[in-house]
A protein has these predicted regions:
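Ferredoxin-type iron-sulfur electron-transfer modules and their immediate structural context
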Residues: 1-99
Length: 99
């Protein structure tokens, strides 16, 4: 479930994007990855809702919500939070075989 108080303790962090003029120079990722420690903090923010809308890709009032791949987000967040990286990757592969 992550950390029960994680949503309150940790602010949401998103990966910084490389400036467009810089990223058109190559085919590298254009978001700077968060550190493993920061990824674990973000995993701790999961509240394990009774009905987790985060794992169902849907449109609500014209805006996309949730995961369009139907990833098992709460389980994955908990695995990231506890540092079980291989199991977290395995969990993602169940719904997304990655290119």
């Amino acid at each position: 479930m992550g950390k029960p108080t994680g949503f309150i303790e940790y602010d949401r962090q998103t990966a910084e994007a490389v400036a467009p003029k810089e990223r058109i120079q190559n085919f590298n990722e254009f978001h700077t990855p968060l550190s493993k420690e920061e990824q674990q903090k973000q995993g701790a923010r999961c509240m394990a809702c009774g009905v987790p809308f985060c794992q169902s890709g849907m449109e609500i009032m014209g805006m996309t919500s949730g995961c369009p791949l139907h990833n098992l987000v709460p389980e994955w967040n908990d695995l990231v939070y506890t540092g079980n990286w291989e199991q977290a990757y395995s969990r993602l592969k169940k719904t997304n075989n990655f290119p």
